[in-house]
Amino acid sequence: MEYITNYTLGELKERFKGLGLEPYRAKQVFRWIYKKFITDFARMTDLSKEHRKLLSENFQFHPLEKLDRVEAPDAIKYLFKTIDNHIVETVLIKERDHYTLCVSSQIGCAVGCTFCATALDGLKRNLTTAEIIDQYIQVQQDLGEEKIRNVVFMGMGEPLANYENVKKAVEIMISSEGLDLSKRRITISTSGIISQLKRMAQDEVMREVNLAVSLNAVSQKAREELMPLTKTNTLKELMEVLKSFPLPKYRRITLEYVLIKGVNDSVKDAEKLAKLIGKHKKRFKVNLIPFNPDPNLPYERPSLTDIMKFQKVLWKHGISNFVRFSKGIEVFGACGQLRAKRLKLEIEGAVK
């Protein structure tokens, strides 16, 4: 049986035609799912009993099963299980006056960043569109009256390596009949796959959302050590692509920079980062992210003094920047950490 949340509105209209249903019925169903977050055909009361029966015989809703919900003052971490028994992480970030949802796009990751817990287990597979959307639906159902305002593709996986499914999820998110999110409220974070960035630049849907690029180093050699994909996606070519990437008015590309003690956090590194950006200050803003400590990774967080020194250099050069301390440290909030803990406990339990 198919998952109905795998379909964009246009696709669902075509699918409904094949079932003998009028295309406008797809809009009705979309509104129930994405406006009221009803995931039970029996409750869709503007459909006839016959139509509800037909839909329930052909479609189902939740490809994810909620395993765990761990709450801290500034974030809620959800663990979901797929039908093939993989674990997916989702984080709901509590901002001052709204919520931001951090969704995963893959199970594991093939990029292999040495500072990321998700990379420890390698890539298992891409998430389907339904699995991406179901993260949103189940968290919103859990929230009730309060609404998710922003979505960031910054969870497990490389979104641009799962391009088609991520794009379909974005289409559902921005559809006026779907989640109806502003494109400005959606951010895709990528490690910098150059071929996919070029594809994104030509894509009328994808190029309109916010773009964040995980930079993390200011030289080819240093970036290769932290992010092995840099060997085939060079820093030089990446910056060239970003400097010509088509941007909506008043929008900037975010350069994400994970600050790691003794690795990339020196004043000299900050000066090199400023030089890398050069005259394109109005095109970029820098998101400084102090490393979130993990017992499985050989890195440490810089001191607050060193973080401030790094930031001061960027301000000196007129580069817009901010420091983002990881939300949800109490609940293993960084990418892949709670999943890794859960897998470790399951393995230990099996051994016992």
Positions of the model-derived regions?
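Auxiliary Fe-S-binding modules of radical SAM enzymes
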Residues: 1-88, 94, 243-251, 257-352
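Short linear Ser/Thr-Pro motifs
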Residues: 69-70, 104-105, 189, 214
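Generic beta-strand structural signal
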Residues: 76, 88, 99-103, 111, ...
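Residue-level structural signal for beta-strand termini and adjacent loop
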Residues: 92-93, 165
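Canonical Radical SAM [4Fe-4S] cluster-binding loop centered on the CxxxCxxC motif
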Residues: 94-134
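Ferredoxin-type iron-sulfur electron-transfer modules in oxidoreductases and energy-metabolism complexes
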Residues: 130, 134-144
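Conserved AdoMet/S-adenosylmethionine-binding subsite of the radical SAM
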Residues: 140-150, 155-317, 322
